[in-house]
Amino acid sequence: TFNKMWGVITPQEAADKIEEQKKEAGITEPKNLEEQAISLVGTDIYEKLIKGYTEKQWGRPCTELPSFIIKRLPVRLTFDNNYFNALYQGIPVGGYTKMIANMLGDVEVRLNTDYFEHKEELDALAEKVIYTGPIDAYFDYKLGELEYRSVRFEAEVLDQPNFQGNAAVNYTDAETPWTRIIEHKWFEFGKDEEGNDLPKTVISREYSSEWKLGDEPYYPVNDEKNGKLYEEYKKLAEKEENIIFGGR
């Protein structure tokens, strides 16, 4: 990315350019996501690749988001374009649905069952319960509601073999309403279960939106206000003897 944006070749050239733009922005100690991003990759790449996408995803200006959110993204002064650093990366053959179906085996699965409506009965089934729902919902919002972001998917079947040539493409500009498009066939290298080419393709446009009660909460808003409220709920959770809290 640094090479395409600035024409730099060596890691030192890229580092010098980032430092130059960081100084131009007057940043010494980053106070928010915007300043942290500029410190990491410079103003040009922040405005081209980070600002629009991040503000669509979170529904808030980057200046109102905490700096630690952007720190998890890897920055490499190399030509390695992998997102993860793991030596081995992959997805299950046949997809996650097939893998989960195999894992469940003889396990009883209850669909359309509200845990809270049957809590006493369900808790009695095992010594430990793994709860993966929102922590504020577990405590009936007694300390107030945490804020979440929700996601809406718009699927479309296209009468063509290839739409974008890749499983996921992010749209980093502010003008495009969706954050990314998923072309599902490329998770299986464009083949069906028998290894045949697929003449059509399915895409899903992904839209981020503010969560409200009744919506599906996809991820929590990770700012200072919500962080403080979560810590209070965490104290309550630590007093629950037979419940293991998981999830995002």
Question: What kind of region is each of these model predictions?
Answer:
Residues A14, K31, R76-D80, F84-A86, ...:
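Residue-level signal for well-ordered alpha-helical segments
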Residues G7, K51, W58, T63, ...:
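Short linear sequence elements within intrinsically disordered, low-complexity coil regions
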Residues Y115-E232, L236:
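Mid-domain catalytic core of redox enzymes
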Residues A237-R248:
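Short FAD-binding loop at a beta-strand-to-alpha-helix junction that anchors the flavin cofactor
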Residues K17, G190-K191, I243:
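Short, highly charged low-complexity linear segments
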Residues F2-K128, T132, D136-F139:
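Active-site/ligand-binding neighborhood in enzyme catalytic cores
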